[in-house]
């Protein structure tokens, strides 16, 4: 099987490719990534040595480029990880999110229709459901929870999800959607909460926490998320949505304190800052559908996963420093000269 993985140089996509290229040596994986600021060629550089991996630099919004790639490669499956994903950036510049997350999805699905009605999977987020009250721990998002977005980011992902299901119903494109809770693990771009806290704490810098730190997130290790995506694309029912959650709810303040404790750093590094506009209160995912129908279950407890993640960042500070310095942006160009 030949599989197109878009956004494969990003955090979740690169972890997916590291797993898949080893787990399925007889499948061919083509990674398409525009290498925008959060796409890091260093995340997948080691995969270039594998016979079942190929990297292609390109933008999913470039219709002519995407069509030529589909015509050349004859894909059997498309998995779309490509997305602008940082909520704060979406508040500052929503247009970029609309273009990549919605228009890019349309370009990919049009190509999938044109070149053989190719199986298509959309990687989405629990943020399309909006948020839950802090005082109702019994409530969780199910696949039937109505879409009720809060930010330009989540709205762009919801728009893409609606478009995916419209292509299924109107054109018969064989699609699935996965919606995950907050991912954590290696290779996460250091603009997101966990790598920000680790990086700043290692340098004894203050740790900004929105509001009072009471907002709750459900955390899933990126490997567990990607195992779920793998099960869905290979065994899931076409036309269905599947939630993937980590069963690991923590307040943002609890999470920061856990990281500081493991790093032996003082809690007085914490600084409470003005809350994010429209900040979602609580996310919690009900994963019972994918557990029941496909046999998926998480393999990491939060305690195991966060310790391993912290250790990875401690042992890979050069990776973070390359990003901070901008050096990572040159890695792909250097690879072309070899």
Show which residues each predicted segment covers:
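N-terminal Rossmann-like NAD(P)+-binding domain of SDR-like oxidoreductases, especially those catalyzing
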Residues: 1-183, 313-316, 325-338
């Amino acid at each position: 099987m030949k599989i197109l993985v878009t956004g494969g140089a990003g955090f979740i996509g690169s972890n997916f490719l590291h797993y898949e290229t080893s787990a399925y040596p007889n499948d061919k994986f083509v990674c398409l990534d525009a290498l925008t600021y959060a796409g890091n060629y260093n995340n997948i550089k080691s995969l270039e040595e594998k016979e079942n991996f190929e990297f292609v630099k390109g933008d999913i919004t470039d219709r002519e480029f995407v069509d030529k790639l589909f015509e050349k490669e004859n894909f059997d499956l498309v998995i779309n990880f490509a997305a602008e994903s940082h909520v704060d950036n979406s508040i500052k510049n929503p247009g970029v999110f609309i273009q990549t997350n919605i228009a890019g999805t349309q370009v990919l699905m049009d190509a999938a229709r044109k070149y053989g009605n190719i199986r298509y999977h959309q990687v989405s987020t629990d943020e399309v459901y909006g948020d839950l009250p802090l005082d109702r721990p019994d409530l969780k998002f199910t696949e039937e929870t109505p879409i009720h977005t809060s930010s330009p980011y989540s709205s762009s992902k919801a728009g893409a999800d609606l478009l995916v299901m419209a292509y299924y119903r109107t054109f018969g494109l064989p699609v699935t959607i996965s919606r995950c809770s907050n991912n954590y693990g290696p290779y996460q771009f250091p603009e997101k909460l966990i790598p920000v806290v680790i990086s700043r704490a290692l340098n004894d810098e203050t740790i900004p926490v929105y509001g009072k730190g009471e907002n709750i997130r459900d955390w899933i290790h990126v490997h567990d998320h990607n195992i779920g995506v793998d099960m869905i694309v290979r065994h899931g029912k076409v036309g269905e949505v599947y939630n993937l959650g980590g069963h690991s709810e923590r307040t943002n303040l609890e999470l920061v304190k856990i990281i500081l404790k493991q790093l032996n750093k003082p809690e007085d590094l914490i600084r409470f800052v003005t809350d994010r506009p429209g900040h979602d209160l609580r996310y919690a995912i009900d994963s019972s559908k994918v557990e029941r129908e496909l046999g998926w279950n998480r393999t990491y407890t939060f305690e195991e996963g966060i310790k391993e993640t912290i250790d990875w960042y401690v042992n890979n500070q050069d990776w973070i420093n390359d990003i901070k310095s901008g050096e990572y942006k040159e890695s792909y160009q250097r690879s072309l000269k070899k």
